[in-house]
């Protein structure tokens, strides 16, 4: 059953520019994500869009969840997936959200992310 959906679109250059500030990187991205960004800084925008989509899926915005409590990584084939920590993980457990499906698409200037939170059991 679907718990919720979330979507976001962001300008890639805006996020890339913000990543020039170390404080932005540590506030927004986990250590694993920061390692990923070393190989492709444009992934910073993709990950940020996914984080925004996840908090929209929960209906909380970043009031209840810190951005670095949502980790966006890629599997061996490049498919994005989400790990939740802290308040994000607690919120998912409270609502029985066991799976978050992620889709990312981009142009040269924009990136869009779409997530679906799935309840496997009630």
UniProtKB/Swiss-Prot annotation:
Molecular-function GO terms, alphabetical: holo-[acyl-carrier-protein] synthase activity; magnesium ion binding
Subcellular location: Cytoplasm
Catalytic activity: apo-[ACP] + CoA = holo-[ACP] + adenosine 3',5'-bisphosphate + H(+)
Example of a GO biological process term: fatty acid biosynthetic process
Cofactor dependency: Mg(2+)
Main location: cytoplasm
Homology family: Belongs to the P-Pant transferase superfamily. AcpS family.
Role summary: Transfers the 4'-phosphopantetheine moiety from coenzyme A to a Ser of acyl-carrier-protein.
Superkingdom as given in the UniProt entry: Bacteria
Gene Ontology CC entries for this record: cytoplasm
Binding site for Mg(2+): 8, 52
SUPFAM superfamilies on file: 4'-phosphopantetheinyl transferase
Protein name: Holo-[acyl-carrier-protein] synthase
HAMAP family in alphabetical order: AcpS (MF_00101)
InterPro entries (alphabetical): 4-PPantetheinyl_Trfase_dom, 4-PPantetheinyl_Trfase_dom_sf, ACPS, Ppantetheine-prot_Trfase_dom
Record keywords: Cytoplasm, Fatty acid biosynthesis, Fatty acid metabolism, Lipid biosynthesis, Lipid metabolism, Magnesium, Metal-binding, Transferase
Organism for this UniProt entry: Lachnoclostridium phytofermentans (strain ATCC 700394 / DSM 18823 / ISDg) (Clostridium phytofermentans)
């Amino acid at each position: 059953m679907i718990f919720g959906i979330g979507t976001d679109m962001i300008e890639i250059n805006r996020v890339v520019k913000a990543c020039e500030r170390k404080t932005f990187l540590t506030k927004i991205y986990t250590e694993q994500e920061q390692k990923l960004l070393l190989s492709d800084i444009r992934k910073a925008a993709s990950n940020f869009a996914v984080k925004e989509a996840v908090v929209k899926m929960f209906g909380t915005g970043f009031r209840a969840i810190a951005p670095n409590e949502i980790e966006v990584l890629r599997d061996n084939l490049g498919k994005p997936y989400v790990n939740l920590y802290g308040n994000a993980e607690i919120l998912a457990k409270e609502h029985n959200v066991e799976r978050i499906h992620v889709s990312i698409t981009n142009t040269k200037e924009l990136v869009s992310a779409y997530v679906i939170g799935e309840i496997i059991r009630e």
